[in-house]
Regions:
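Conserved active-site and cofactor/substrate-binding residues in soluble primary-metabolism enzymes
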Residues: 2-5, 76-80, 112, 124, ...
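Flexible, small-/acidic-enriched active-site or ligand-binding loops
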Residues: 101, 165-214
């Protein structure tokens, strides 16, 4: 991802200036680059970051929450969204509670916040809460397992799952690349088996059938 961004930036510059650029992107820098939140925290206070699970490091509640039949992601960052969230959950008084009145207070009392929210969210299903929260403008979404993910109407509509033909296994399902250009290119066949095209390739090199049989007899391939 970082390499692609660098390449696109260099191409854009070449388009405007006519000059090329050397684009570098190491795995080390890429790994550290993905830790921007925790790196910024450590550089500011030199305190070792701790594991947060699905919790956001700067906002609460902004995390996965349990429901009656699964899990839900809630992103109530900011006071306006938090007020709508509390009201949608049937507890507008949470906004007046000193423990939850501000984001700073909610971060400091995260365990208590999670406890009261879980007590409410576990009374209804994930789909019920998605409908309620979306209706009030609270960012949210279901947390899928794999069966739910591949059954999702949008995943099916986008044709993310494709099939390749295998002589032994039949139609083999796989996920295509997420990038689509125009109609896209579909993989119709699986990778060749070891040595499957030996005769064809050796034939292009001028190796005849008799020599091929000799090579096979000698165990060359």
């Amino acid at each position: 991802m970082w390499a692609v961004q660098g390449i696109l930036a260099a191409l854009y510059e070449r388009w405007h200036t006519g000059k090329g650029r050397l684009v570098e992107c190491s795995l080390l820098e890429t790994a550290i680059g993905f830790s921007s939140w925790t790196s910024a925290q450590w550089l500011a206070d030199h305190k070792e970051p701790t594991r947060q699970g699905s919790r956001h490091r700067q906002n609460a509640p902004y995390q996965r929450m349990q429901t009656k039949d699964g899990y839900l992601m809630v992103g109530a960052a900011g006071e306006a969204i938090w007020a709508r969230c509390a009201k949608a959950l049937g507890h507008p008084e949470w906004c007046e509670d000193p423990r939850f009145a501000t984001n700073q207070a909610r971060m400091a009392n995260r365990q208590a916040l999670e406890a009261v929210m879980n007590a409410v969210l576990t009374t209804k299903t994930t789909n019920d809460w998605v409908e309620v929260l979306e209706a009030t403008g609270v960012p949210c979404g279901p947390v899928y397992d794999y069966a739910q993910m591949f059954a999702d109407p949008q995943v099916r509509h986008r044709g993310l799952v494709q099939y390749a033909s295998d002589a032994e296994l039949g139609e083999v399902p796989h996920i295509r690349t997420p990038v689509r250009i125009g109609e896209g290119v579909r993989v119709r066949n699986v990778a060749p088996k070891l040595g499957q095209h030996n005769a064809e390739i050796f034939g292009r090199l001028g190796v005849g059938q008799a020599e091929l049989q000799e090579l096979r007899a000698r165990g060359v391939f």
